[in-house]
């Protein structure tokens, strides 16, 4: 079996974002990313700060650790990053999940196609807005979304930090009007240890985003979400 670079395996917990928000799940966090977003809340996956924590694991080794941690208390696994779409060997992990009746979710920015996208039960494409400092390759994104037409469950999600991000998201929604579309408020404070102080700011920003969306006649078919896990655990890792 091929090896997958793994930084974290944890759970059961709940999914805090996107189309499966609130879903009970286990997490497998992979290392490596082709982006370097300015506000990334998991920069340790690509900035070298956690390079000594990376474990090269086969799909079966990952599955065994998931079972050790979660026992029979889960039937869903979220594959996170970094950008797991960089890793061809994820295909083998998905095969193990399917053999054991486990559903899967994965989020990627839409910069790389993998044939195994079609094997993901809940796939989120999350192109990065202007505040990230990254630039969307719409030719690649068009290619990916065209390939996903046969997929039963996928969506678009954009994290919003400012008005330019919201305009980017609005244009993206109008480019792909048939794709389920989620807006998520961004976390502007990645170092705040006091969850109560962070929660106050998150709620304020969430309310502002709701107000902006309700005032728009171009965003009538979107869902506006918080980053749920930050409401409960703040910036804590491994939850």
Regions found by a protein language model. Give the residues of each.
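A short, flexible beta-alpha/helix-coil linker loop
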Residues: 12, 45-47, 188-190
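Solvent-exposed, flexible loop/coil residues
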Residues: 18, 23-24, 50, 232, ...
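N-terminal pre-triad scaffold of radical SAM enzymes
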Residues: 2-39, 43
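Conserved Radical SAM active-site core
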Residues: 7, 24, 36-121
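Conserved residues at beta->alpha junctions
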Residues: 31, 81, 160
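Conserved beta-strand segments that form the floor/walls of ligand-binding pockets within enzyme
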Residues: 5, 27-29, 41, 78, ...
């Amino acid at each position: 079996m091929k090896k997958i670079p793994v930084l974290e395996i944890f759970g059961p917990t709940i999914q805090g974002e996107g189309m499966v928000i609130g879903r009970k799940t286990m997490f497998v966090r992979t290392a490596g990313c082709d982006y370097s977003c300015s506000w990334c809340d998991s920069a340790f996956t690509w900035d070298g700060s956690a390079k000594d924590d990376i474990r090269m694991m086969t799909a079966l080794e990952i599955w065994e650790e998931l079972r050790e941690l979660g026992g029979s208390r889960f039937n869903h696994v979220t594959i996170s990053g970094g950008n797991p779409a960089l890793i061809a060997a994820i295909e083998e992990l998905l095969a193990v999940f399917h053999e054991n009746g486990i559903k899967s979710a994965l989020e990627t920015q839409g910069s790389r196609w993998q044939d195994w996208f079609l094997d993901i039960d809940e796939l989120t494409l999350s192109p990065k807005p202007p505040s990230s400092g990254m630039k969307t390759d719409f030719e690649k994104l068009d290619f990916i979304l065209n390939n996903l037409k046969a997929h039963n469950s996928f969506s678009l999600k954009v994290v919003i930090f400012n008005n330019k991000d919201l305009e980017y998201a609005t244009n993206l929604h109008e480019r792909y009007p048939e794709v389920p579309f989620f807006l998520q408020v961004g976390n502007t404070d990645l170092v705040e240890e006091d969850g109560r102080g962070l929660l106050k700011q998150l709620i304020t920003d969430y309310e502002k985003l709701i107000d902006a969306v309700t005032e728009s006649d171009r965003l009538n078919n979107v869902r506006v979400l918080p980053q749920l896990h930050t409401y409960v655990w703040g910036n804590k890792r491994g939850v």
